[in-house]
Amino acid sequence: MQPLSILVLHGPNLNLLGKREPGVYGSTTLAEINSLLAEAALKLQAKVFPLQSNHEGVLVDAIHEALGKHQGILINAGAYTHTSVALRDAIAAVNLPTVEVHLSNIYRREDFRHHSYIAPVVIGQISGFGVQSYLLGLQGLVAHLKG
């Protein structure tokens, strides 16, 4: 059986994980998160393909290119969660099962972070568990895909 192919998208400023506001986002780097996801994916008979970009259009293009290439998407859109209709529309357009994750609990933060444009078009959202948000999101996505 072929492993499931999961696109993992990391949005703006996530390249600074480990340095940026460790009290909010923790001390784990993006490279470490990607490594943990790759390990977890192997155990779940899946493979992850991570991409980080600070540019909305790059993320939209990656979502479009996922069609026919990946079975699902795991996304931490960062600040674009609260601002990007383009990401929301791209996810809706490709209609691939997608899980939204956040390291911090976006509902315990500033009011403007309480709204997600992405949440209505994904199968689930996990926030507030630090690095575990990614791992739980991956588990949930794979379980959904395996039906």
UniProtKB/Swiss-Prot annotation:
The protein's enzyme class: lyase
Disulfide bonds: none
GO MF term set: 3-dehydroquinate dehydratase activity
Record keyword Lipid biosynthesis present: no
Pfam families tied to this protein: DHquinase_II (PF01220)
Keyword tags: Amino-acid biosynthesis, Aromatic amino acid biosynthesis, Lyase
Binding site for substrate: 76, 82, 89, 103-104, 113
Active site: residue positions: 25, 102
BP GO terms, sorted: amino acid biosynthetic process; aromatic amino acid family biosynthetic process; chorismate biosynthetic process; quinate catabolic process
Catalysed reaction, written as an equation: 3-dehydroquinate = 3-dehydroshikimate + H2O
Spans traversing the lipid bilayer: none
EC code(s) of this entry: 4.2.1.10
The keyword Amino-acid biosynthesis appears for this protein: yes
Superkingdom field: Bacteria
Pathway assignment: Metabolic intermediate biosynthesis; chorismate biosynthesis; chorismate from D-erythrose 4-phosphate and phosphoenolpyruvate: step 3/7
Site residues, Transition state stabilizer: 20
Family: Belongs to the type-II 3-dehydroquinase family.
NCBIfam families: aroQ, PRK05395.1-2, PRK05395.1-3, PRK05395.1-4
Subunit composition and interactions: Homododecamer.
Function comment: Catalyzes a trans-dehydration via an enolate intermediate.
Name listed for the protein in its UniProt record: 3-dehydroquinate dehydratase
